[in-house]
């Protein structure tokens, strides 16, 4: 929820084509059976054990020292309310440590990476990790695509079925986790299936309870960082629109030379307005106060300004090609999740397209969208009143934290926690918390996973990750996405 890449639009993360609907095995999550004579549950090859589960399909295996890393698919109903109405193949990966270890269920809320990696909770508990691709992100998209089946309830059921299937092999404690939209996804999963997981760690997860009230974002941008940085960012954003005609001409030339088109948003000029509106949000989402020195002067050359805009917001994001990969996110933002808006008084007189900064404008018009009121409010009420053993981690300077999940009464008694990393951005994690909060968070994760050492159970200040840091496996760079997409 993160490999550095070309920035994509702010409202919002392939391997071949896999088998589609209709020809898949039965959907039942049946227990694993059939180990050969003399072969125990522990010595049986893990790939063979997984593939004995009905609906599992092997894609590839990649070597990684100390683990088995498998890429697989699992047959899921297109519609969990009507499982007879077709199936699709949902891609996931398995980082296998041991069936004697706890398992972390991770999702970014977008595509799944097929490069071995380990989330922070997985390192803390020294466990296995199942990473699932969110439905409708290719190749995990039903064919034909019935977009009405893309919602948080259907996605939670995807996780529930995969958990039920794999629990037959991985019988120890399970935790759910994810960052950004993945943190939202982990939270929604717990709301609909509160007893599947022993705990949930949600990183930088937005909570847009009232989509029509975005005043928290205005308050955030009025106070984030220091005044000098805020003022200069606003000045550069305004200058980007003052020089609009010159830069849009260059933008269109770049698009023509690189096969980029603007059919969905309507024109390069409309795309550029979105790119500029992303600028301040994207800066704080992915950068720190210490990066303010990189903001160019208002009188900088157009070349320098163009480069800064592309580096921070990214010109590719609002092209048809940039939007297509994230159509499922924009669809959800415009039907259930909500999306942020914010006032920009310093841009008065320079904006040409009122209302353009909205998810409906990033989804092809042949895909119908209808807002469902109350979906986020339901999750919010559940978190405040009924959730248990949940940890929310935010970054102080991350715009998405302006509307966080809030904990209700007796949160500590329910082992619910919310911590904020000082000065942190959209890549904030447990390791960046102040010492006492870091110890509490780490200790809780260990306890939920059932692997807290005696010393930690006695004094949480002794809590630390059980697995040593692996520079390759634990590298979690922030995925560069523009502001309207978490």
Regions inferred by a protein language model and the residue ranges of each:
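A catalytic-pocket lid/entrance helix-loop region that shapes and gates access to the active site
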Residues: 196-259
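Conserved acidic catalytic loop of the alpha/beta-hydrolase fold
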Residues: 157-172
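Alpha/beta-hydrolase fold nucleophile elbow
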Residues: 170-180
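Catalytic-loop region of hydrolases
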Residues: 2-9, 28-128, 434-486
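Alpha/beta-hydrolase fold active-site neighborhood
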Residues: 248-374
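N-terminal cap/lid subdomain of alpha/beta-hydrolase-fold enzymes
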Residues: 73, 79-156, 366-386, 396-399, ...
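Glycine-rich nucleophile elbow surrounding the catalytic serine of serine-hydrolase chemistry
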Residues: 178-188
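Catalytic histidine-centered segment of alpha/beta-hydrolase-like enzymes
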Residues: 424-435
């Amino acid at each position: 929820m993160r490999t550095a890449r070309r920035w994509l639009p702010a409202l919002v993360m392939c391997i071949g084509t896999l088998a589609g609907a209709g020809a898949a095995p039965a959907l039942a999550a049946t227990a694993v059976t059939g180990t050969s004579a003399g072969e125990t549950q522990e010595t049986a090859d893990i790939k063979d054990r997984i593939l004995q589960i009905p609906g599992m399909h092997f894609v590839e295996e990649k070597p990684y020292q100390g683990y088995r890393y498998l890429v697989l698919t699992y047959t899921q109903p297109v519609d969990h309310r009507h499982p007879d109405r077709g199936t699709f193949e949902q891609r996931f990966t398995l980082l296998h440590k041991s069936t004697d270890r706890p398992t972390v269920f991770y999702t970014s809320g977008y595509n799944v990476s097929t490069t071995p990696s380990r989330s922070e909770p997985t390192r803390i508990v020294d466990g296995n990790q199942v990473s699932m691709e969110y439905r409708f992100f290719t190749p995990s998209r039903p064919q034909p695509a019935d977009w009405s089946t893309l919602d948080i309830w259907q996605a939670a059921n995807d996780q529930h079925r995969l958990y039920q299937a794999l629990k037959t092999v991985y019988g120890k404690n399970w935790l759910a986790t994810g960052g950004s939209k993945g943190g939202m996804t982990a939270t929604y999963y717990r709301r609909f299936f509160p007893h599947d997981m022993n705990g949930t760690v949600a990183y930088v997860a937005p909570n847009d309870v009232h989509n029509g009230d975005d005043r928290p974002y205005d308050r955030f941008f009025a106070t984030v960082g220091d005044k000098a940085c805020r003022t200069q960012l606003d000045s550069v954003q305004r200058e980007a629109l003052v020089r609009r005609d010159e830069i849009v001409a260059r933008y269109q030339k770049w698009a023509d030379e690189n096969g980029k088109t603007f059919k969905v948003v309507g024109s390069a000029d409309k795309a550029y307005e979105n790119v500029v509106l992303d600028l301040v949000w994207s800066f704080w989402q992915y950068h720190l106060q210490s990066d303010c020195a990189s903001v160019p002067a208002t009188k900088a050359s157009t070349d320098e300004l163009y480069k800064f805009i592309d580096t921070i917001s990214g010109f590719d994001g609002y092209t048809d090609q940039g939007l297509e990969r994230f159509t499922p996110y924009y669809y959800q933002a415009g039907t259930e999740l909500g999306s942020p808006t914010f006032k920009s008084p310093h841009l008065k007189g320079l904006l040409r397209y009122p209302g353009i900064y909205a998810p409906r404008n990033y989804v092809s018009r042949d895909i119908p969208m209808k807002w469902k009121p109350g979906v986020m409010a339901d999750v919010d009420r559940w978190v405040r009143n009924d959730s248990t053993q949940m940890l929310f981690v935010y970054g102080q300077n991350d715009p998405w934290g302006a509307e966080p999940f809030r904990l209700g009464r007796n949160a500590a008694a329910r082992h619910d926690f919310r911590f904020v990393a000082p000065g942190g951005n959209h890549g904030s994690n447990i390791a960046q918390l102040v010492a006492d909060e870091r110890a509490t968070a780490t200790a809780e994760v260990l306890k939920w996973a059932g692997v807290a050492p005696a010393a930690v159970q006695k004094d949480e200040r002794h809590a630390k990750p059980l697995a040593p840091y692996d520079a390759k496996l634990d590298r979690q760079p922030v995925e560069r996405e523009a502001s309207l997409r978490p």
